[in-house]
């Protein structure tokens, strides 16, 4: 089935064909997102407009097009200064003097000292993702932030659903990790994560580890393209249908929140796209058909 045909059918949420965090998230850099100002010492990022150069400590291939990159913070005893759910802006200057700026969400713990970790997928026409993949250990990249999209508070909701695809997993993983790392936070979490193939499932080991340790609190469902599933694949195959979501999700309620992050096709089919960086837009797609509205859904 062709990509155009897949994305033209509003009944389904499609496994990821390819989208950068930049393509789904440049809208992060907006007046809707606020730069989080933290005055405490011991944090590399405290908000504001100052770009900070961090040295690449380690670059490790995870798949043919995905790297795990570790950057050194300004001081070995520093934490990043990020909170859940927030991200950083990255910048590099082209040989012609043009700035390329994209947002990325770290996968490291907020209290991790000395380093900052990212999982970044390379795309053929992705200027920043190609630049980052070409960085050599010891070279630097400019960062600033953090930019907070949703400030999580323990037990904000009785339950949440995290629906994402591809690189859209990063802010959803932040929420999953934050909730399960706090014994006082009893929020139940359902993660529904779609990708093209099993090899494309990012940070699966981390997600599976959390799910195994919190079986009564966390449920994870993976989807991959039907033509890409291997014989030993234990997740779901094909599309994430409205019928699946109807069985999996709680009914619309003030105690239940859905967070969505992925490429444009996923937004269109699941939740509707954002009107602008400052406007979440109306809920469309499968979630609208299931009775959800703006107060129930947040689009990263």
Curated annotation (Swiss-Prot):
Subcellular location: Mitochondrion outer membrane
UniProt name for this protein: NADH-cytochrome b5 reductase 2
GO BP: any one term: ergosterol biosynthetic process
PROSITE patterns registered for this protein in UniProt: FAD_FR (PS51384)
Binding site for FAD: 156-191
Keyword NAD assigned: yes
Native source organism of the sequence: Lodderomyces elongisporus (strain ATCC 11503 / CBS 2605 / JCM 1781 / NBRC 1676 / NRRL YB-4239)
Top-rank taxon: Eukaryota
EC number(s) on file: 1.6.2.2
Upper classification of the organism: Eukaryota, Fungi, Dikarya, Ascomycota, Saccharomycotina
Domain FAD-binding FR-type: 49-153
Membrane topology: Single-pass membrane protein
Catalyzed chemical reaction(s): 2 Fe(III)-[cytochrome b5] + NADH = 2 Fe(II)-[cytochrome b5] + NAD(+) + H(+)
A cellular component term, taken from the record's GO annotations: mitochondrial outer membrane
Function comment: May mediate the reduction of outer membrane cytochrome b5.
GO molecular function, one term: cytochrome-b5 reductase activity, acting on NAD(P)H
TM regions (residue ranges): 12-29
UniProt cross-references to Pfam families, sorted A to Z: FAD_binding_6, NAD_binding_1
Family per record: Belongs to the flavoprotein pyridine nucleotide cytochrome reductase family.
NAD among keywords: yes
Main location: mitochondrion
